Curated annotation (Swiss-Prot):
SUPFAM superfamilies in the cross-refs: Concanavalin A-like lectins/glucanases, Fibronectin type III, vWA-like
SMART domains: FN3, TSPN, VWA
Biased composition (Polar residues): 1302-1320
Record protein name field: Collagen alpha-1(XX) chain
Origin species: Mus musculus (Mouse)
Glycosylation-annotated residues: 433, 569, 604, 771
Gene: Col20a1
GO CC term (a single one): collagen trimer
């Protein structure tokens, strides 16, 4: 038979089986009955016009069963009743409820089996083996929602085979134990739980139940699991189905992990009916994520060789489902979008479970496995060492050690259980992270290869959280209390609460959380009592309260007035004050009342400096603190200033002629206005005196006669009029031989130093004194001392290019000689090379462009030069050579200089301008440098003038352009005061005027090859070759240079030969030749001159001791010894307890803490009681379009319309793409949808035809479906005949597409498919 013919017969068969025979009588003619799967009865009746308050459906059995009633709301003329006995007789009565009482609408007696027979008789012409059974939404009782009406859909029955296949019945060859673990939490609800029961019954129906076949057990779980019946509780299928029917809904939370542990502990015991030889299957049905850990129990179940199937509904955690289920996951994990879809999953899941059992075969214990029945259990569970967060467990192991132990614990008052698996033969462990003061129920389960033994249980209570130790006041001020306490073990933070002792309301109590066992309470009132309490916290747990009453100190006067750093004109006064102080006033007055003053300091300071004061005077000092409430009492003290300090360390140095130089050390740091110096001979003669400024420390005293003793006196006058005590010494100018050094010579080694050399005088010199200062006399004079055995010294840290005056004198025991002097200017630049007299800077060395350093510089390459020993360095575009000015120029660049470079421009040199060498400021702005522009073939020198304005000079003559022709050229740029000269290959090319240059910066950067348009520290460079780059500190070097590096300009007389030259000219001397043959003996020469003295002989024996010589002169003072710290000595004895220290200052207020993290979501609350019925809702939305009405009479024929113009032919469309081949599953699904749509259309048309005169038109049916992608079917997993309704469940959720709405028309061959976008 063709596929089209089969489809027509199949649709005809389904259409004929849609209506059951109606009973006789006018009342019964308004009632229609239909039998649904599992002996449910669906009824529909017609409403009377003006329906009353509702309907009462009463189904009364003839005998035996209880009466079941269902009250429906208005406009719901249909209902479904389940749980009926198919062989018993029932009476069905339907009443309309009105204000005057119930009115009978319909009455009928029926037997389920008779209704089935009538349906089969009327469908004798249908295809054999198929039936159509109506299915309804879940059964709704009086408590169900009343906002929606039941609707009818028609599906293929799965109780009968399709196309002559026998009905599916699983009779496995080996016994099987199937345990259902059903989620009964609040999230399921009563209505959906009924659908879960239907789902369980659909699975159980397809298995052969019996003691030697398949046994079924069931456990329902929520907050705590409960075994509804064990495996051996029922012997027949009817008993099991009856138990499913009477299964009651529990409600509660979702603790799947605890339920799995319950299965291990209770349902898999031999006493529960588990057979060792039977295959074991666990089927878990849940609709939510577990609130406890499931991994441990799931792993043990799978290790026990138990096949775990998981069925998830709605928003379940798919990752958790895969964690629970056995392998392979595509068979054992199933997820449906809603509870009504469980009915369609049952046939497929039954076949998969059957195939799994059949594939396992009989279970046999492994070789060497010891079968224990009953399984041994440990004994004597002891719970000890209970702390606030832990309990120690110990037990006596069983005689036969298990593979592992499963430890489960939870609070006895309820809460999420936790579990852990302990491997190996252990008998103790410690449970941590527990809650304090909580009783725990602990279970220990041994796990064997053959199952789980009986649990060993015990109870223990954790200790309370330890409170803080005794509170202690560490510091007290008027505004703060510093409280400390011993820390508590296992505490994360402390809660500190404090309140005025006189307060009566708790609302004034303040609290603070701290992490350390101390707290500083601030913002308190002075002189008040406070009650302070502290609690230990660990998460939500709190300990008992530890309290203390403390009192803040009252405001008072300052204390402990002390004086320090007492000088002749000032002193520092300090005090202690209580906080908070706004202002402190300090006043002082001299003892005679002639001098007084006062000062004010902020309240956060505790000291002040008083001055100016008079020397050697006693002062009375008074300190007053001012608070918010006023001033404190006065604290008084006395202090006496010191004498004005006198100059010290006087020394005299004899100068040439009749003058001497007096030197002294000023003991006062500042304040000296003038020094008064007086000298007079002790015999006859007049006294003389001079005054010098207070900033000096030396003075020249003229007119002193030889061999005359003088008394020299000096005293200091201060700015406040105070005079120091005079200081004097006696000095006699002597004519004794105190010869000064001679031949004083100065030279400049570096720009910052001077080399001083002299010829020592005759006589024993103790040391030499070197005084040096600026020749202009504007700066201070400095002095150094040189040992008498040396005749040279180096003066360092000098300014470059600056003239200095240096004086050198010899110091004898009898005094100091006259000083010899000389002046010299420090160098502006260092020597260009160590053995060169030319001064300047070699920038090749400064930038590391030498053979030993270039390899570490990016973008630089080196190659030997054919012109000589100087190598050639190539700078590429990625070379970024930059150095700080201070690293290259230790001194300032002189205004007259010459820039010398030997350069070659390459073909890849950019055509834009680049700076061969330039100086930049800190902001990378050019200040001084040389630009080469290969595009314009010009050379530009630029600098800043004295006004910091940029000035530049450009050379673009023909002789200058040859620099850009690709050969090496030596270029000199001589910069003078008013002009710049350009030399190319040691020949003057041009001269340009330029203004005076400003001083180049001592900071900034120096770069090589930087592109002129570049900005910032990172920039590109030009590509060129460089052999030489120097700056000579002279503008005349270009006229002296001979350009020996250029072969065409070499002169054999002035230029040395290249050591590495391959060929030599006739003008250049060659290397020495080989040694010639020995010559003939010569004549005897004249007598030689007297030879040099021979080497020193060996020391002779010691001589006899000579007489004692005269006493030697006093030696010079030795150098100061260096103290070396010795090893640390042993600790000394403990000293006596010191006085109590001063109170610390008030700390600053801490910053406000960041908000804590959001807490975890609490567990779902218990379902509340059902509320009263609400008010009627607003009118519903507009309904669907009704069915088409009866055809009307033909209207009059209209006038013919005008003929329109002939349209242009359209363009030929493009050929469509080849369609993808569809799988058999997709074709079958489309055929099924089309068939069902046609049947529904015909049913609606039939109903409309039968009742078109009695009721308004009904809306046509619309169903929501999802278009999916084709998916191949594994024939190895689905070897049973699949029912048509099963194809949709083989498609996974991820294979389904967007929802579409299929509207069925009156023509079964026409279907309008509308996407969600087209419906808007």
């Amino acid at each position: 038979m063709s596929l089209q013919g089969s489809y027509q017969h199949f649709c005809l068969w389904m259409f004929l089986g849609t209506t059951l025979a109606l009973g006789q009588g006018q009342v019964s003619s308004r009632l229609r009955l239909a039998v649904l799967p599992e002996d449910q009865l669906q009824m529909k009746w017609r409403e009377a016009e003006g329906s009353g308050l509702g309907f009462l459906v009463q189904v009364t059995p003839m005998a035996g069963d209880l009466e079941q009633e269902l009250i429906l709301t208005t406009k719901t003329p249909k209902a479904t009743v389940g749980g009926l006995n198919p062989s018993k007789s029932y009476t069905l009565q339907i009443f309309e409820l009105t204000d005057s009482g119930p009115i009978l609408l319909a009455r009928r007696e029926f037997v389920i089996e008779d209704l089935k027979s009538q349906s089969l008789g009327r469908g004798s012409r249908r295809l054999a083996g198929a039936t159509l059974e109506p299915t309804s939404l879940p059964l709704r009782g009086p408590d169900s929602e009343k906002t929606s009406e039941p609707s009818i859909a028609f599906t293929l029955s799965r109780d009968l085979p399709i196309l002559d296949h026998p009905q599916f019945q699983c009779t496995p060859p080996t016994p099987a134990d199937i345990i259902f673990l059903v989620d009964g939490s609040w999230s399921i609800g009563h209505n959906h739980f009924q659908q879960v029961k239907d789902f369980l019954a659909s699975i159980i129906t397809q298995f052969a139940i019996g003691p030697d076949k398949v046994q079924v057990g069931l456990t329902q779980y929520s907050g705590d699991p409960q075994t509804e019946w064990d495996l051996n509780s029922f012997q027949t299928k009817e008993q099991v189905l009856a138990a499913v029917h009477h299964l009651r809904y529990k409600g509660g939370n979702t603790f799947t992990g605890l339920a799995l542990t319950h299965v291990l502990e209770q349902n898999l015991k031999p006493a529960a009916g588990v057979r060792p030889e039977a295959a074991k299957v666990l089927i878990l049905v849940t609709d939510g994520k577990s609130q406890d850990d499931v991994r441990t129990a799931a792993r043990i179940l799978k290790d026990q060789d138990i096949d775990v199937f998981v069925v998830g509904v709605k928003n379940v955690d798919e990752a958790e489902l895969k964690l629970l289920a056995s392998q392979p996951l595509d068979i054992t994990v199933h997820n449906v979008l809603d509870f009504p879809q469980l009915d369609t999953l049952a046939p497929l899941l039954s076949r998969l479970i059957c195939q799994k059992i059949q594939g396992r075969g009989p279970v046999k214990p492994a070789a060497g496995t010891r079968v224990l029945d009953p399984l041994p259990t440990p004994t004597r569970l002891i719970l000890t060492h209970a702390t606030s967060s832990s309990i120690h467990l110990s037990w006596t192991p069983a005689l036969y050690p298990p593979l592992k132990y499963l430890i489960v614990w939870q609070p006895s008052r309820g809460g999420a259980p936790k579990e852990v698996v302990v491997e190996g033969p252990v008998s103790s462990m410690e449970l941590g992270n527990l809650t304090s003061s909580t009783e725990y129920l602990v279970s220990v389960l041994p796990v064997y290869e053959s199952g789980v033994g009986k649990s060993l249980q015990g109870r223990a209570t954790t200790a309370p959280l330890p409170p803080p130790g005794p509170l202690t006041l560490a510091a007290v001020t008027p505004r703060t209390l510093h409280v400390t306490w011993p820390p508590s073990a296992g505490v994360t933070q402390y809660l500190v609460q404090y309140l005025l002792a006189t307060s009566t309301g708790e609302e004034q109590k303040r609290e603070v959380h701290v992490g350390q066992p101390e707290v500083l309470l601030d913002g308190l009132e002075p002189g008040q009592d406070y009650d302070v309490s502290v609690q230990s916290l660990r998460g939500p747990e709190a300990s008992e309260v530890q309290s203390i009453r403390a009192r803040t100190s009252a405001l008072g006067p300052p204390r402990h007035l002390t004086f320090s750093d007492v000088r002749y004109n000032s002193t520092c006064v300090s005090w202690e004050a209580q906080r908070p102080v706004r202002l402190v006033k300090v006043s002082y007055i001299s003892s005679d009342g002639s001098h007084s003053g006062q000062t004010q300091v902020p309240g956060n300071l505790t000291s002040a400096t008083l001055g100016p004061l008079s020397s050697s005077t006693m002062y009375t000092v008074r300190v007053t603190c001012f608070y918010l409430g006023g001033g404190s009492s006065v604290l008084t003290g006395h202090v006496t200033t010191q004498k004005a300090p006198s100059p010290g360390q006087l020394s005299v140095m004899e100068l040439p002629g009749d003058a001497v130089k007096l030197s002294w050390l000023a003991t006062a740091l500042s304040g000296v206005l003038v020094y008064q110096i007086k000298w007079m001979p002790l015999g006859e003669g007049k006294a003389r005196e001079i005054s010098v400024p207070g900033t000096l420390g030396t003075a020249t005293l003229p007119g002193l006669m030889k061999h005359v003793e003088y008394e020299i006196t000096i005293l200091a006058y201060y700015r406040d009029g105070t005079r120091s005590d005079p200081v004097s010494l006696r000095y006699t100018p002597s004519a004794a031989s105190r010869s000064p050094p001679s031949s004083l010579a100065l030279s400049s080694e570096t720009p910052n130093s001077l080399q001083v050399n002299w010829t020592p005088p005759s006589g024993h010199v103790l040391h030499y004194r070197l005084n040096y200062t600026l020749a202009s006399g504007s700066g201070p004079e400095k002095s150094i001392s040189v040992p008498g055995t040396r005749s040279h010294a180096v003066l360092r840290d000098l300014m470059s290019a600056t003239k200095y005056r240096v004086l050198v004198s010899a110091v004898y025991r009898a005094g100091e000689s006259m000083a010899v002097s000389a002046t010299y200017r420090t160098a502006a630049c260092p020597a260009l090379h160590p053995d060169s007299s030319l001064s300047g800077f070699d920038l090749m060395v400064a930038f590391g462009l030498v053979a030993k350093e270039y390899a570490s510089i990016r973008g630089v390459a080196m190659e030997p030069s054919a012109l000589g020993v100087v190598p050639t360095f190539t700078l590429f575009k990625d070379a970024q050579l930059m150095r700080r000015v201070s690293d290259i120029y230790p001194a300032t660049l002189p205004p007259e200089h010459t820039i010398v470079f030997l350069v070659r421009l390459l073909p890849e040199t950019p055509r834009e301008a680049f700076a061969l060498w330039q100086m930049m400021a800190e902001d990378f702005q050019p200040i001084l440098g040389v630009l080469l522009d290969a595009g314009r073939k010009s050379l530009t020198y630029f600098n800043h003038d004295s006004r910091a304005a940029l000035q530049e000079v450009t050379f673009d003559l023909q002789d200058a352009k040859k620099i850009f022709f690709g050969s090496f050229h030596k270029v000199h740029i001589a910069v003078g005061h008013s002009k710049v000269r350009l030399y190319v290959d040691c020949r003057k090319v041009a001269e340009r005027p330029i203004g005076d240059a400003g001083s180049p910066p001592t900071g900034g950067f120096i770069t090589l090859g930087r592109l002129a348009k570049a900005r910032g520290p990172r920039s590109s460079s030009a590509t060129f070759q460089l052999q030489m780059l120097q700056i000579v500190c002279s503008d005349t070097w270009a006229d002296k240079d001979r350009c020996c590096e250029i072969p065409a300009l070499r002169d054999g007389e002035t230029c040395p030969a290249f050591p590495s030259a391959c060929a030599y000219s006739s003008e250049t001397p060659g290397p020495p030749g080989p040694q010639g043959p020995p010559g003939l003996p010569g004549r005897n020469g004249p007598p030689g001159q007297q030879g040099h003295p021979g080497p020193k002989g060996e020391p002779g024996p010691p001589g006899q001791t000579g007489p004692e010589g005269p006493g030697g002169q006093q030696g010079s003072p030795g150098t100061q010894g260096r103290a070396v710290q010795g090893p640390m000595g042993p600790p000394g004895a403990k000293g006596e307890k010191g006085d109590q220290g001063l109170s610390g200052l008030q700390g600053l207020s801490g910053q406000q803490g960041i908000p804590g993290k959001t807490g975890l979501q609490g567990p779902k609350g218990m379902r509340g009681l059902e509320g009263p019925a609400g008010l009627p809702g607003p009118p519903g939305p507009r309904g669907f379009q009704g069915l088409a009405g009866a055809r009307g009479t033909n209207g009059e024929r209209g006038a013919p319309g005008a003929v329109g113009p002939t349209g242009l032919p359209g363009s030929k469309g493009e050929r469509g793409e080849k369609g993808e081949p569809q799988s058999l599953a997709t074709i079958f699904q489309l055929v099924s949808q089309a068939c069902e749509s046609a049947i529904r259309t015909h049913v609606l048309k039939l109903n409309s035809f039968l009742h078109e005169n009695a009721r308004p038109p009904m809306p046509f049916m619309a169903e929501t479906a999802k278009l999916g992608r084709p998916r191949s079917i594994d024939p190895g997993l689905h070897n049973e005949a699949l029912l048509p309704g099963d194809w949709g469940h083989i498609l996974r959720p991820e294979d389904q597409g967007e929802p579409v709405t299929i509207s069925h028309t009156s023509n079964p061959r026409l279907q309008e498919v509308q996407t969600p976008e087209s419906l808007e």
